[in-house]
A protein has these predicted regions:
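Bacterial N-terminal signal peptides that target proteins for export
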Residues: 1-7
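A cross-kingdom marker for long, charged
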Residues: 196, 204-291
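Outer-membrane beta-barrel domain signature
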Residues: 120, 125-133, 137-140, 144-145, ...
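N-terminal Sec/ER secretory leader and immediately downstream segment
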Residues: 22-129, 264, 278-290
Length: 291
């Protein structure tokens, strides 16, 4: 179950009931859920995307010296390490998703149809597949009967895929923005919260732009499914468990990327300190907050 990246969602925990004890699944259950949902792999793609963003920005502006660029790339590799992102997401899921929803999602992902869908989504993650979809997806979507198109649109909406993709883009922009101020004398490093506020209008715009693209992607990715199978998938995503699954994983993703952007600022402050340079005031604030 994907839904972003063109698709992202994941899950779990906290039992409901007046006198029912709070029983929580083990971390192994959450790891299995993240793997089967595709989130495990998707989180490993964030750091390379960050590095690509910095390289593109550097090529346009040459804002950093070669030495500073190398330090920035090392800091990104550390701050956005896949294992660190996975740990944050898993911990957030453990703390916020009801156990019965975790069980329901895992049952779905483990079913024959759930496994088929996961395989389709995994195949769609390759660069070649994405390139083909960008061309064929819109044409396929335009050729679909209205009833099939409506199912695909409902699926994209139920999985919050455009929101998740926009969150990744904005949080990546925040990380790049903070990172590129490294080594630039007199240029303050803005707080993550301030940057989030500044980029919010762009995030809303990204959602608008990404939604039709994701619907076209979904038309292509899920083309092998029959109408009945697609109906079952949409019904699951729109169910109480599926809805919580999507919302909780979106919040967990945002938390993981926000923490990574903060870690990036801290890593760069550490590098400046090791080089014996005086930290800019804003970086001193970041370092103090980290402590």
């Amino acid at each position: 179950m994907q839904g972003s990246g063109v698709a992202l969602v994941a899950v779990l925990l906290s039992v409901v009931g007046c006198s029912t004890p709070d029983i929580r699944p083990s971390d192994a259950v959450f790891d299995e859920l993240m793997r089967k949902s595709g989130l495990w792999i998707q989180l490993a793609q964030v750091e390379p995307m960050m590095q690509a963003g910095v390289s593109q920005a550097q090529a346009r502006t040459t804002a950093l010296t070669e030495e500073d660029l190398a330090h920035l790339q090392e800091a990104i590799a550390s701050a956005y390490a896949a294992d660190a992102l996975r740990t944050t997401v898993r911990d957030q899921l453990v703390a916020t998703l009801p156990a019965q929803d975790a069980a329901a999602v895992l049952r779905w992902l483990s079913s024959d149809l759930g496994q088929r869908i996961t395989a389709l989504e995994a195949a769609g993650l390759s660069p070649d597949a994405a390139t083909k979809r960008s061309d064929a997806g819109p044409r396929l979507l335009a050729s679909l009967p209205a009833s099939r198109r409506e199912k695909v649109e409902r699926l994209a909406k139920a999985t919050f895929s455009a929101d998740a993709a926009a969150a990744i883009i904005v949080d990546t922009m925040i990380g790049v923005s903070r990172g590129l101020t490294f080594g630039r004398t007199g240029v303050p490093v803005e707080r993550v919260e301030d940057l989030k506020s500044k980029f919010q209008s762009q995030k809303d715009r990204f959602v608008e732009v990404l939604e039709p693209r994701i619907v076209a992607d979904f038309a292509s990715i899920y083309q092998p499914l029959s109408d009945q199978e697609l109906d079952q998938y949409v019904a699951f995503c729109e169910s109480s468990a599926g809805h919580e699954f999507a919302l909780t994983s979106l919040d967990a993703l945002d938390k993981a990327l926000t923490e990574a952007a903060t870690r990036l600022g801290q890593r760069l402050a550490d590098v400046s300190a090791m080089q014996g340079g005086a930290l800019p005031p804003a970086l001193r604030v970041v370092a103090a907050r980290a402590g």
